[in-house]
Amino acid sequence: MKKVFARKYMVVFEREEHDEFVVYNTKKEWEEGHTHIHTYKQAMYLVDCILNNKIPKKVNKYFLVSLQRLSTSKKYKEQIQRRLDGDTKEEYYNRPKYYRK
C-alpha cells in the first residue's frame, strides 16, 4: 500500500493490486478504524466529512457505515445511526413567544 494523502489523523492509502483506496483513522486500531473505497474522490469526501462532522444526504448505506466506522465522536456516530435507521432529524417544536409557560 502506498500513502497518497494525510490530513490531521486521517490517512488515505492506495492499493494498486485491487485498484481501490483505504481510508484509515490513526486514532483507532486498524481492525476497527479503516474502510475500503473505490475512488480517490470518494476517499477525499469521506475524510472531509469526518474532519468536519458532516452527514451527507445523498449517499449510499455503505458510505454512512464507513463514516460511522471511522468516526471517534459518539454524538456523530449517533447522528449517522439515526440516518441509517430512517430518522432524519430529532423532533423539535418552536413555541410561539406569546405562549405561557
Residue ranges and their predicted role:
Residues 25-30, 34-56:
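A short, charged, amphipathic alpha-helix used as a generic interaction element across diverse proteins
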Residues 1-26, 31-32, 56-81, 85-89, ...:
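Short N-terminal "domain-start" leader segments
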